[in-house]
UniProtKB/Swiss-Prot annotation:
Signal sequence coordinates: 1-22
One annotated GO molecular function: ion channel inhibitor activity
Gene3D superfamilies named among the record's database cross-references: 4.10.40.10
Residue pairs linked by disulfide bridges in the UniProt entry: C36-C50, C43-C55, C49-C66, C57-C64
Pfam family, one: Toxin_9
Assigned protein family: Belongs to the neurotoxin 02 (plectoxin) family. 05 (U19-lycotoxin) subfamily.
Organism expressing this protein natively: Lycosa singoriensis
Record text about domains: The presence of a 'disulfide through disulfide knot' structurally defines this protein as a knottin.
Protein name from the UniProt record: U19-lycotoxin-Ls1b
Length: 80
């Protein structure tokens, strides 16, 4: 392969890697700006759970926490 083709492939790969990393950081920033709570964090009517997780409260409607979905638990148990 010529050096020009190798350089082009390297540059395209680097741009792809950087774009994927930037997308991950952007999605994390959007969720934190939105004010949502992660798994096993406190939640309320004003502080929703991220990623559509359910907000589960105790019997007297206190100590509410975000729980993982069944899909997330299944993926953790059986691997991705």
């Amino acid at each position: 392969m010529s050096p020009k083709v190798q350089a082009l492939i390297f540059i395209v790969g680097l741009i792809t890697l950087l774009a994927a990393h930037a997308q991950e950081e952007l999605s994390d920033n959007i969720e934190s700006e939105r004010g949502c709570s992660g798994a096993y964090k406190r939640c309320s009517s004003s502080q929703r759970c991220c990623e559509g997780r359910p907000c589960v409260c105790s019997a007297i409607n206190s100590n509410c926490k975000c729980r993982k979905t069944y899909t997330e638990l299944f993926k953790e148990y059986f691997g991705k």
